[in-house]
Amino acid sequence: MKVRAILNPRAGLGARRALEDVRRGRPSWRDLEVKLTTGPGDAQRLAREAAAANADLVLAVGGDGTVNEAARGLLGSGVPLGIVPAGSGNGLARALGIPLSPARALRALEGALVRRIDVGTVNGVPFLNVAGVGFDALVGWAFHRAGRNGGRRGVLTYVRLSLALVRSYEPVPLRVEAGGEEFAARPFLVAFANGPQYGGGAVINPGARLDDGRFELVLYDDRPLLAILASAPRLFLGGIERVRGYRRIPTTRAVVTLERPLEHHRDGEPEPAALRLEIALLPRALPLLVPRTTAEDPSGPFTPPA
């Protein structure tokens, strides 16, 4: 099997160990080539080149940003993507039940099945798991800047930044068109969720299916600071959908028009400010390598066979 591994050496936790594990390879991956990224856009380019060179499988070794880029390079090629988590959030890997240890992830993927997942787009740019605008995007930008300036990455940094920013955060009024509804709102955040969770294990869209031909537009209303802080543990402990102010709308398309331009994110990666966000879906557009236990779990993130 011809395998190309695309590794971001700056992805964060576990990247160096992942490089060693991937180089060692698995018995069924005799023809394994490792390519290192050096900057934004490299993973997408390397994945596209791998598909053009008739690779049988591309492995994205890194965080959610590396996975997103590699997937963009493979869209339309039919070449499946495997995820070896080596970042700080690893949202999609967690949703797929892929072990966070690179060595264990490689073992799990060796006997994995191929499942096709839906791919969302924000203003035409793909995301796989969760995109959004509002407080989560603000924290994502701060997290990105902290990492770029040499700060520590990881869930604790994300929590620290969230606590620092939440006190002064002012939501922006916006207008939503989704699921046959149109309404004005001033939410704390709006998430466009194809998958169930952010990186770090924070579940924003419980019960999500990655292949059901729709995404969920999730709104969390602006509430008093203490109420927001009190509800935050629900993201990790379960039950966020029962929190007052939480609402989700299943849809295949949405438009969010903001009162003023605001930054957003795709799979945790910061995107520049925009006044209008158009979200759409590409049904089952990406073949993905999924651990067998997850692929066959009727309560997992894939639609059970009829």
Residue ranges and their predicted role:
Residues G147-L156, Y198-G201, P206-A227:
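Gly/Ser/Thr-rich active-site loops/lids in small-molecule metabolic enzymes
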Residues M1-V58, N68, A295-A306:
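ATP/NTP phosphate-donor binding region
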Residues G132, D136, A191-I204, P270:
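Glycine-rich phosphate/pyrophosphate-binding beta-alpha loops
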Residues A5, A178-G179, A184, R209, ...:
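ATP/nucleoside-binding phosphotransfer catalytic cores, i.e., glycine-rich phosphate-binding loops
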Residues I6-L7, T37, L75-P80, A86-F188:
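Catalytic core of DAGKc-family lipid kinases
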Residues T66-S77:
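Short Gly/Thr/Asp-enriched flexible loops that form oxyanion-binding sites at enzyme active sites
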Residues P9, V61-G63, V84-A86, N194:
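Glycine-rich beta-strand-to-loop/alpha-helix junction loops that act as flexible
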